[in-house]
Amino acid sequence: MNIEVLKNEIYKLKEEKNALIVAHNYQIDEVQEIADFVGDSFYLSKVCAERPEKVIVFCGVHFMAESAKILSPHKKVLLPEIDAGCPLADMVTAEDVENLKKKYPDYSIVCYINSPASVKAKSDVICTSSNAVKIVREFPNDKIIFLPDKNLGSFVKKQVPEKDIILWEGFCITHYKIKKEDVEKAKSLHPNALVLVHPECRPEVVELADFVGSTKQIIDFANTSKEKEFIIGTEMGVLYSLKKLNPDKKFYILHPGMICPNMKKNTLQSVRDALLYERYQIEVEEEIMEGAKKALSKMLEMG
C-alpha cells in the first residue's frame, strides 16, 4: 500500500479513537515520523503516564509497552507487533531476583527498565539509561544489585564508586557488537568527530567516548554542540532525529551492525492495524502490576 495512504489512514484512525502514538528512537524512520512523541524509555514512560489519551499505540518492544500499561492500567496499550521482544530483557527472571534476595538480603535491587514486568515487580526501583546514575547515587541503600545489563551497571559503578554494586551478567546483543577497535578505526577515519555512545556498550568502548548517554541525551548533546561531526555508538534509528534536527552536521555510525531487529519490526502497516483492530493489547497480571507499578513510580518520583 502507498505510504501516504497508510499515513492518512493512521492519522484518521488516531483521531477517531483519541489515540496517542509514541515511538522509541530506534524505530524505523516512517514510524518515528507519524508518532506524536519520539524519545527514550524514560521520556516515553513519563509521556504515557501524563497524557490524557485512553489508547496508546507504543511503537517499541514488549517491555516498553508493558511499562506503559503498568503506569497507566486503565488505558488500552497496543503493541503493533506482539513478537517485538528484547533479548536483554529475557536474560533475567523473577526467580533469579528471588534467589539474589536470598543470597544478598541486605542489598536493594535496582532494575533497568529493559526487563519483564515480573522482574520489575520484585525490584526496589527501576531506572533507565538516562537516570541510572542518579537513581543509584540517590537510593538510600549503599548496597545495590544492578540488573540485568552488566555494561550499563559497569558505567554506573564507575560513576558511583562509593556504593557496593553487584552486577548481573546480561547485555544488549546490538551494543555488544561494538569493540574498542571499531572506535579506534572510526576515530582515524573521522579525526574531527566526537564519539557519542550509549552506556549499554562495553566498558572499553565507553572509555574511549567523548560523551556517554541515553538516546535522548545523545540527540540533545549533538543538538547543542558547536562541533559538526559525530561518531554514533548506538542503534542507527537515532540517525533519523539527529539528521532531521541537525541538517548541517555529519553523523557516522560506529558499527554497520547497529540494527536492533526487534525494534525494526513495527511498520506503518502494523501501526495502522493496531489502531484499526485495537491489537495487540498488553495485559499485566494484577499481582505483578502492583509491585512493578511501585518500582516504576519510585523511579518517576526520584526523577
Curated annotation (Swiss-Prot):
Keywords: 4Fe-4S, Cytoplasm, Iron, Iron-sulfur, Metal-binding, Pyridine nucleotide biosynthesis, Transferase
Annotated Gene3D superfamilies: NadA-like (3.40.50.10800)
Keyword ATP-binding: no
Pathway it works in: Cofactor biosynthesis; NAD(+) biosynthesis; quinolinate from iminoaspartate: step 1/1
Necessary cofactors: [4Fe-4S] cluster
Subcellular location(s) per record: Cytoplasm
GO cellular component: cytosol
Cofactor detail note: Binds 1 [4Fe-4S] cluster per subunit.
EC number: 2.5.1.72
Domain of life of the source: Bacteria
InterPro entries with a match to the protein in the record: NadA, NadA_sf, Quinolinate_synth_type2
Gene Ontology biological-process entries: 'de novo' NAD biosynthetic process from L-aspartate
A Pfam family hit: NadA
Residue positions binding iminosuccinate: 24, 41, 112-114, 129, 198-200, 215
Positions of [4Fe-4S] cluster binding: 86, 172, 260
Record's catalysed reaction(s): iminosuccinate + dihydroxyacetone phosphate = quinolinate + phosphate + 2 H2O + H(+)
Principal localisation: cytoplasm
Molecular function GO terms recorded: 4 iron, 4 sulfur cluster binding; metal ion binding; quinolinate synthetase A activity
Function noted in UniProt: Catalyzes the condensation of iminoaspartate with dihydroxyacetone phosphate to form quinolinate.
NCBIfam families: nadA (TIGR00550), PRK09375.1-2 (NF006878)
Family: Belongs to the quinolinate synthase family. Type 2 subfamily.
Protein name: Quinolinate synthase
Organism: Caldicellulosiruptor bescii (strain ATCC BAA-1888 / DSM 6725 / KCTC 15123 / Z-1320) (Anaerocellum thermophilum)
